[in-house]
């Protein structure tokens, strides 16, 4: 019997009553029988953004297989039609090999294409929403396959109309890419590449540097970690909390609670909606949660390389992960009156 601990990058979670792997087309054929009243269905990708309960899951878990990516001309763009089960990083590497560099800043992000669309991934100045053409979705309420456009996805910071929605399943989608190099739009990446912001660099240069940065933070899947880097922090869901957005008034109160000058441009930035995005890692550190912190006797800990990652040090349970995450959110809320929002999807759990 398959368990969530086997199919998730965090490596926790109970057994699954029924586990199925199938292509998107096979899923559409079988779906009406799966989405029956009283039966739980969960469709997963790479399991890189999922925290499941230690209790047995009584329903069906479906993992979609990948299929060949189809490439076609679309006027000023090249259209890549990609299945939901395709590895995101494999897609990045594939497009780079063909001379399309736009996805290179998002190298090394674990999980699948479907998960990337649902979670609205972004990294180092690039975002999946910026190149999205369409999303193919199975609607379990109507048993039909429908197409979502960019507006239908209602993208927000690390979220979309399809995140945490069980009756709509992403089958695949299209990206609209242009060949050639891409400008470096993120300060940390520009510094690492030793170039000015806006400089056009080859996708290979960008990818190599992004993978190195992620490896230094312990934020790469184990199989992508370059030789010589530590792999002890790879059992995680990446960043466990999203960076909170606060009002400018709240930011003023926050300044009085932290050391003078601590709230600089490296930990805050203006949000596109007029608020201020604050580094969740900064809030954790200011609340006393150092890298490597763990509750006594627990195998769940904060990564020794990145303050926002909760890692499984070996044999951790979902209960231990939630216990640590709960302690963090309560402490940050009490100290700064800021509620941290978890980034991963919870199955059978609440924080």
Curated annotation (Swiss-Prot):
The top EC class, named as a word, is oxidoreductase
Matches recorded under PROSITE patterns: FAD_PCMH
Reactions catalysed, as given in the entry: UDP-N-acetyl-alpha-D-muramate + NADP(+) = UDP-N-acetyl-3-O-(1-carboxyvinyl)-alpha-D-glucosamine + NADPH + H(+)
Quick one: which pathway? Cell wall biogenesis; peptidoglycan biosynthesis
One Pfam family for this entry, by name? Answer: FAD_binding_4
Gene Ontology CC terms:
cytosol
What residues form the catalytic site here? 158, 239, 343
Name the major location. Answer: cytoplasm
Q: Which cofactor does it need?
A: FAD
Q: What does this protein do?
A: Cell wall formation.
Family stated for the protein in its record: Belongs to the MurB family.
Question: What is the protein's name according to its record?
Answer: UDP-N-acetylenolpyruvoylglucosamine reductase
What organism does the UniProt record list as the source? Tropheryma whipplei (strain TW08/27)
